[in-house]
């Protein structure tokens, strides 16, 4: 998740070879896109690219955008992508957290990725006080991606819950759906 043009689609493409449209324009992403990401420890996770946040959205669009952001309710971790060279970065971060709170997912673990380090140079490391972890990355060049994947795997392992579930025979299709999502790429 993150503000518009922060690099969310570029990150999804870098991590999963998703091939989603990644352009520097408003509303390049209009629908959530989910892909399988294989972590270094061989775990597989589902990664979803969402529509970008924007302040002062016209009221007739607010509900439509919130419906696409509902994906966050099903997430184990929120990956917050921030444009680290945007002059209004602090307000953008605040807008994202306001929306997460409105969606009632503000209590989920957050990894904040300060993206576009290839453009930021040697700027000091920034910290997101609400995030479980903050790091600098470049979705374009791959800088910091390995460290991010290690941290993501670590946080997922810390929060892993094992569930044994019995399904009725007529609901067996759900098991196949879950397997397809997790084991195909």
In which residue ranges do the predicted regions lie?
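Conserved G1/Walker A P-loop phosphate-binding module
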Residues: 1-55
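Flexible beta-alpha connector loops of hexameric P-loop NTPases
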Residues: 19, 52-61, 85-88
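Active-site glycine-centered loops adjacent to acidic/histidine catalytic or metal-binding residues
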Residues: 49, 115, 138
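Catalytic P-loop NTP-binding/switch module of NTPases
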Residues: 61-69
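Conserved C-terminal guanine-recognition region of P-loop GTPase G domains, centered on the G4
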Residues: 69-78, 82-133
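Canonical P-loop GTPase G-domain recognition
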Residues: 118-162
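Short, surface-exposed ligand-recognition loops at beta-strand->loop->(often short) alpha-helix junctions
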Residues: 166-171
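Conserved small/polar residues in nucleotide/adenosyl-binding loops
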Residues: 183-184
